[in-house]
């Protein structure tokens, strides 16, 4: 009997805790969705130096990494925009997302790539993600400022919003430095 209980406990222990995980898009699919006119995507590695990281900090943006992979969308050699993927913690699980940035530095589109939380999946709804379109540069990107919260998804909304703000700031710094 004890062996059966021990085996049952072991079986439960190895079952993934995230039974609600859903993958919606790959990073490549998201890039093509955001820039359908692109005929090529070039991945550039952008490394922020200490001064740039301090600039982000001064803007109230917490840089989780100094190195970022940025997809440059091109058509006939001309740059159309940029796509950056990232992951943030929702409540307890990771949310993978991608942000398309237009040449003027504004958000073109936000896509949720994977969502693993049991609640708060409403952040994937187009109406919520559309709030980011056109934001960037001098416009505030924050819950309560110009991005509405979703009841029951407060942490997911807040963390994805913080992530979008971070990506907008990182791309702006990289462009100022001539890295993009």
Residue ranges, per PLM feature:
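Bacterial N-terminal signal peptides that target proteins for export
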Residues: 1-7
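N-terminal signal peptide c-region/cleavage motif recognized by signal peptidases
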Residues: 14-16
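Flexible, solvent-exposed loop/hinge segments and secondary-structure transition points
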Residues: 19-150, 154-158, 162-180
């Amino acid at each position: 009997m004890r062996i059966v209980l021990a085996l049952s406990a072991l079986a439960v222990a190895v079952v993934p805790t995230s039974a609600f995980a859903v993958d919606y898009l790959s990073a490549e699919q998201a890039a093509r969705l955001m820039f359908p006119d692109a005929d090529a995507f070039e991945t550039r590695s952008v490394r922020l130096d200490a001064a740039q990281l301090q600039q982000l900090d001064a803007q109230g943006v917490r840089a989780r990494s100094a190195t970022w992979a940025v997809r440059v969308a091109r058509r006939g050699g001309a740059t159309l925009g940029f796509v950056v993927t990232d992951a943030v913690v929702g409540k307890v699980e990771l949310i993978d997302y991608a942000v398309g940035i237009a040449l003027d530095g504004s958000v073109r589109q936000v896509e949720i790539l994977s969502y693993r939380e049991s609640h708060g999946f409403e952040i994937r709804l187009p109406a919520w993600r559309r709030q980011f379109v056109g934001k960037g540069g001098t416009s505030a990107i924050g819950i309560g400022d110009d991005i509405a919260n979703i009841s029951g998804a407060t942490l997911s909304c807040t963390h994805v919003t913080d992530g979008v703000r971070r990506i907008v700031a990182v791309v702006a710094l990289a462009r100022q430095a001539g890295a993009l």
